[in-house]
Every structure is written in structure tokens, then in C-alpha cells.
Amino acid sequence: MNKFEDIRGVAFDLDGTLVDSAPGLAAAVDMALYALELPVAGEERVITWIGNGADVLMERALTWARQERATQRKTMGKPPVDDDIPAEEQVRILRKLFDRYYGEVAEEGTFLFPHVADTLGALQAKGLPLGLVTNKPTPFVAPLLEALDIAKYFSVVIGGDDVQNKKPHPDPLLLVAERMGIAPQQMLFVGDSRNDIQAAKAAGCPSVGLTYGYNYGEAIDLSQPDVIYQSINDLLPALGLPHSENQESKND
């Protein structure tokens, strides 16, 4: 029995699922840290912080940077820095800087993963409504989807500022299902992180976990999605469509 035979709509996470956004996010984080005269983190480290929205990303970046600065100063025999600005205020300042820099680098630092456009097109052609649920700040979402030429596939888009409770809370997924006019159990949610799978479980949606995303360095199977796929186009046979073999470059 096909466990997805009752699916009437599909919703996707964005970062780490449809797009590799780490280059742009890491560049903006590092520029913001540098502007505050803090150590820069680098893409490999920033990848482990992605997934809970920009505010949490800033908190993680600042916590690491302050600790790294303290370690560096101790190694050099220098006294620790006595911060005049409380950490909460530094997070707020860092977020404002990040938003400015990310607006400059988001498009050039974000790429579609292979098979994304073909898969979205095939699902849309089948008549399935498609939704997007991301914790990314809402103002960045629509321009990015347009630049990547995938905005046309989505009938519902929920950004991080569109709901009070972000993933892993179920509210964003429940809102998408409501706008699609279907029950949560009829909406398949596809993501790459434990936040995605936890949100799907809490909302009552069947879930697909993809192995190639970020997920804080954890294997997606630890979150126990209903199905695990290596590639996004593995969705197609599960939903009664032929498997797409068209290759798309990372820079498409």
C-alpha cells in the first residue's frame, strides 16, 4: 500500500531542502561579525546554525564569536574584553547588520539543489498544490524565489515573519494546509532537518526527510521521518509520477 496515496498537496522547507543557501548566509553572518570586531565563523560552522530563523542564527553566531574571542585573547595572554553592551543588545545590532548584508548577497549566494525545478514542475503539472514553509525572514523569501525562477510553482508561501510560532511549532504547516483547503494528513511535508520533521509530526502531516541538507550535523533518520530520500526527485515515483533523470547544475 502506498503510504502517500491520500496526499492532496505538498509543502517544502526552503534552506537545505530546495536551495543551498549556506554561502550567502555565511557571508552575511561573517560580515556582520566583522563589523562588530568579532571573529568570523566561516561557512562550515554557520551551516550547523541554520534552520531556526535569523534571530536564533544571530544568537548562535554571537555566542560562538564571544567565546572564540575570549579563547584567542587568553591564548595571546591578553585580558578578557569587558563588553559594555549586553548580549541581548548585541544580538539586536548583529541582526540589523545581517539583514543589510544578506540583502546584498542572498541571490548570488543561493543555488537550487539538483532536480528541484523539474520535481516542482512535475508535481504542479499533476495538479498538486505546492506550499513553502520557511523560517527565513519573510522579506527575503519572495525575491529569492523569483531570482531562482521557482516562485511560479507555489500557491502558498509562509515566511518566518508570517506566523508567531516558527517551525518546529506546527502552526506554519497547519496554516498552509488550511490555505490549500486540505486536512493536515493530506499534506506531505518535505524537509531536511529535525525542525521540519518535528513540525510535520506535531501538525499531523506525513513527512519526507532529505539526507543532503544541513540539520545541525545530525543524520535525518534520527528524527524518524515517514520516508527518507537521497534526492528530491525520489518523491515523484512515490506520488505516482515517473522518476526525473534530468540533471540540473548547482548554479541553475
Curated annotation (Swiss-Prot):
Cofactor(s) needed: chloride; Mg(2+)
Binding site for Mg(2+): 13, 15, 192
Disulphide linkage map: none
Gene Ontology MF terms: chloride ion binding; magnesium ion binding; phosphoglycolate phosphatase activity
One Pfam family linked to the record: Hydrolase
Metal-binding among keywords: yes
Keywords, alphabetical: Carbohydrate metabolism, Chloride, Hydrolase, Magnesium, Metal-binding
NCBIfam families: HAD-SF-IA-v1, HAD-SF-IA-v3, PGP_bact, PRK13222.1-1, PRK13222.1-2, PRK13222.1-4
Quaternary structure, from the entry: Monomer.
HAMAP family in the record: GPH_hydrolase_bact (MF_00495)
Stated name of the protein: Phosphoglycolate phosphatase
Protein species of origin: Escherichia coli (strain K12)
Record lineage: Bacteria, Pseudomonadati, Pseudomonadota, Gammaproteobacteria, Enterobacterales
Name of the gene this protein is made from: gph
